[in-house]
């Protein structure tokens, strides 16, 4: 029986994790659940799973939960509680599924405690990849990616890295793969949020539409698998059946295929090196549409090009790009800038920011805040 500390229990990754736990209550126990403000759903989860701890990051939400809960679950609040519980001696696995910079500290604390971290928090690698991966090595932590493309690479690399030539991340191409660039200016937020294959939140849907999401995954792969930028390739694959591939020097290519469902990835991270039932039915190749693959159009999808340039630049450039993208997408979703403005704003912010190399999470967070403020100033030129 493995004790799981689930950070971000009320989000989509959290819900999928719990659905896998439900199938294997003989193997996994929920030790801790965390959420930000959704105390109503947390109450339901506490009643069902009866964890030792429930953490509401928002203090007032924690107070509301503690006044109404009837189980023996201990209610905690604040980010420091997250940092403590991931390092608890009874925590075996940590599902790090808190979105954004808010999830970095607890993920790093889990690493420093030498836990198995099932990493769904992108920012830990995009913003603090050097810091994070050095800690993984130093504290002998076990890092397993919770992302369909990176999980695919992780699985394909189980045969070893000898003769590894390159990896290839697949991208759906988003809803505008076949839309002429001349029409990009008129794309609306609702159109950008209509992803063809995956059910996602609005921000990540826009990232998929600009292909920034794939650019961020390129940066994650660079750190996760200790690669050079030249060893990372992207191919557009609209069906999202092939999740990623690994190319070897002998001419062999290993790919991981499956239905687009995060439960497959999560169950693999939880059971590794074994495999367990995820609740997802197997792919039927005789009933699968024709698989298409295209080279990405860097002129149409400038954000992907920017991500490769940023990776080559290194230092705080990834922090700046991520911050500028988040602010630009927020303004786009609020109808304050158009779709084509997103990469322009990111590029301008990258040019304006001073280039440094952060050495701590505090420096990373500070750099992130400065980049966000600079992006807001740059956006004032638009509209």
Swiss-Prot record:
Entry EC number(s): 1.1.1.267
Cofactors demanded by this protein: Mg(2+); Mn(2+)
Protein name: 1-deoxy-D-xylulose 5-phosphate reductoisomerase
Pfam families on file: DXP_redisom_C, DXP_reductoisom, DXPR_C
Single GO MF annotation: manganese ion binding
Pathway assigned to this chain's UniProt record: Isoprenoid biosynthesis; isopentenyl diphosphate biosynthesis via DXP pathway; isopentenyl diphosphate from 1-deoxy-D-xylulose 5-phosphate: step 1/6
Entry-linked InterPro entries: DXP_reductoisomerase, DXP_reductoisomerase_C, DXP_reductoisomerase_N, DXPR_C, DXPR_C_sf, NAD(P)-bd_dom_sf
Keywords: Isoprene biosynthesis, Manganese, Metal-binding, NADP, Oxidoreductase
Organism: Ruthia magnifica subsp. Calyptogena magnifica
Superkingdom in the source lineage: Bacteria
Family: Belongs to the DXR family.
